[in-house]
A protein has these predicted regions:
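Catalytic-site neighborhoods of secreted/periplasmic enzymes
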Residues: 1-32, 129-132
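Active-site rim elements
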Residues: 19-21, 78-84, 132-136, 152-162, ...
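A long, amphipathic alpha-helix that forms part
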Residues: 30-38, 68-109, 174
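Active-site His/acidic residue clusters
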Residues: 33-82, 117-130, 265
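A short aromatic-rich beta-strand->coil structural motif
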Residues: 48-51, 56, 145-146, 171, ...
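C-terminal cap/loop subdomain of S1 sulfatases and analogous C-terminal strand-loop tails that border
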Residues: 119-125, 131, 153, 165-168, ...
Length: 280
């Protein structure tokens, strides 16, 4: 819908969830971002930017200068296009960070990178491959979370578990705003809290909501990641033929060897923790 429905004062998208005018951001121009931040600086006001281009989302239409770099390296033209789209997106992110640096805004600006789902490009079509987007596997669930704040966050690569539900408490803490006790997630800038986390949880829903007033009606799978173990529990109402799946993500990060039948006690223990988190 219209960007104003989300509480934004400025924006491009007015109808389609896949862009309409918003499709131009990143692909054709970054000027609306520059204009917005320049206006905020002129008015001496803090600003919030949600930069969410359809990059590397389809349509995969990268410029030839980027596609040429991958045409002979990728296993297919579809994959080459996707790789080029990723670099195109990287370029625009770099331009955004450079804008902040050039105006001495970086030290007072928290930048958070997140994605809504993973994507494994199907070599034989323009679509995503199985076991990626909309699946219960890491190809669809595992995405990068990056934080940039030169004045407060030193560059590092954390081996600990993080979740998208951590973004809200992280931003609230950074802004000095009290975090409601009912809000799930932890502050990712708190190294002690991150290191002490035991597990993360999640659910995979149908693409379209089955009942907007009852989220449980759309659940396909629930999952828990504890250390190197990942358990996936199907919703029998949605996936009647599916079985529980247990994987050792250190030894089998592509989730091809289901250990559930061999480790029933682990399945029971992890299922209890998953049920304690949420039982639809």
């Amino acid at each position: 819908g219209d960007f104003t429905r989300g509480g934004f004062t400025h924006g491009m998208t007015r109808g389609s969830r896949h862009g309409d005018e918003g499709l131009k951001i990143g692909r054709e121009t970054m000027q609306p971002l520059w204009d917005f931040m320049n206006e905020a600086q002129h008015d001496q006001k803090p600003f919030f930017v949600w930069y969410a281009p359809l990059l590397p989302h389809d349509p995969h239409t990268p410029p030839e200068r980027l596609l040429a770099k991958y045409r002979d390296l990728a296993p297919s033209l579809h994959v080459a296009r996707y790789w080029a789209m990723i670099e195109w997106f990287d370029e625009t992110c770099g331009a955004l960070l450079q804008f902040l640096d050039d105006r001495n805004l970086a030290d007072n600006t928290l930048v958070v990178y997140a994605a809504d789902n993973g994507w494994i490009q199907d070599p034989g079509s323009p679509r995503y491959a199985p076991r990626s987007k909309q699946s219960q596997y890491d190809g669809g669930l595992r995405t990068p979370i990056m934080v940039r704040w030169p004045a407060r966050a030193q560059p590092t690569d954390s081996p600990h578990l993080a979740s998208s539900i951590d973004l809200a408490p992280t931003v609230l803490h950074a802004a000095g705003v009290s975090v409601p006790p009912t809000l799930q997630g932890i502050n990712l800038l708190d190294a002690k809290a991150v290191a002490s986390r035991r597990a993360i949880y999640g659910a995979v829903f149908t693409h379209d909501s089955q009942d907007i007033t009852r989220p449980a009606a759309s659940v396909r799978w629930r999952w828990i990641m504890e250390g190197h173990r990942k358990l996936i529990i199907p919703n029998p109402a949605r996936e009647p033929a599916a079985v529980p799946e247990l994987y050792d993500m250190t030894l089998d990060d592509e989730e091809t060897r289901n250990l559930a039948a061999d480790r029933p006690e682990e399945v029971k223990a992890l299922t209890r923790r998953l049920d304690d988190w949420w039982t639809p």
